[in-house]
Amino acid sequence: MMVNKKEKKLGFTTIQHIPRTKYGLSNNDYCVADAIYHLSNNPNSIVFGWCFATRETLGSFFDLSKRTIINSINTLKAKDLIEVDNQTKYLRTTQKWYNEFVLYQETIQKKYKG
């Protein structure tokens, strides 16, 4: 008997490799941080400013295990790229992520648009 699971997948992640390698992040680490950034900035979120997706849900986006997500979260936290609320375990990216990754991407886009 086949069980029909409702899968949650993200379409794509544009990886900025220069800052990724500068911070020693794997592609998985980058994808996890990028998902946290976008989920915590969703204006329709019931908890604006925080990503409240479970580790399992984050894993389902990329076909990664819960353990892999936890390892990525630990890596990102150690590099001060995300923070974890100790009480709720919600996640959000830090100003450092924004400065080093989001602004980098915006700078590149502007450079090649005009």
Give the positions of each predicted feature.
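Winged-helix/helix-turn-helix nucleic-acid-interaction surface
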Residues: 66-114
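Short recognition helix of helix-turn-helix/winged-helix DNA-binding domains
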Residues: 1-64
